[in-house]
Amino acid sequence: MKILPTLAEVKKLASDAKYNVLPVSYEMLSDFTTPIETMKILKNVSTHCYMLESAQANETWGRYTFLGFNPKMEITCMDGKMKIGNLKVKTENPSGYLRQILADYKSPRFDYLPSFTGGLVGYFSYDYLGYSEPSVKCIVEDTENFKDVDLMLFDKVIAFDNLRQKIILIVNMPLDDVEVEYNKAVMELKQLAELLKNGEKKKDPGGRLLGEVTPLFDKVQFCDMVEKAKHHIREGDIFQIVLSNRLSAPFEGSLLNTYRVLRTINPSPYMFYFSGTDVEVAGASPETLVKLFLASAHMPTAAARETLLQAVHH
């Protein structure tokens, strides 16, 4: 079992004070499973998991599919009440706490590993704008009760390399007691490989609608919004606006199979499946908006404005 980096290399890197964690990895062939089948295994051992992937413009799959489960910590905030693991604080600046957390997880980059080797996965709601731009008053009725932010800290990553037909298993180890933590990481990699090969899959309950799909606004209300938007455009108040009308329906089951179909019929640059404490999300979008890579932000030259998103509260 070839583990990278070696213990000797880790000891050398640990002497650099700017790092406090380090990704230890193991490669295996991927011909015995698929990302969806792997997700079924992960859902059998953890209710908290995610899948991130992309399809390129020529409809071939992007290079990496990332999966994670069993987060080390969950971080949420709603109405200024922030929960970091078991710690509860009241704050008007949750971003400050997030920066403090990320400061404790600085790791070196390795050319043989994908760009994402662990970190925070989750969502920021539109209401989060109130923390970063308090001058922007957006007073709307909260009909869904989503958290302002819900993030999970994943220190283990399963990366499908779709170009090389390999699976890269990654475990992030702290650098306070190098030899002990390295051996622990190696053991976790072995357990993770065994889980992927022989783990029991959670039976997919499927999903079905229990009632009619209804819009948030009826036709008269929506047309009134359109007329107001046209007025503000003519007045020069705005130059672009996206009017949306959420469709909702009672639902039972899981969105995993929905995501499985979605990634097939609508392969997109930005596709995601996320399962948390009280929400499950499956989505596909033609826009990645911003990708941060090696301290450089990359933005698409053109981005569409439509996003297909399905979410279920549990």
Task: Identify the meaning behind each predicted range.
Residues 1-314:
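Extended alpha-helical targeting/anchoring segments
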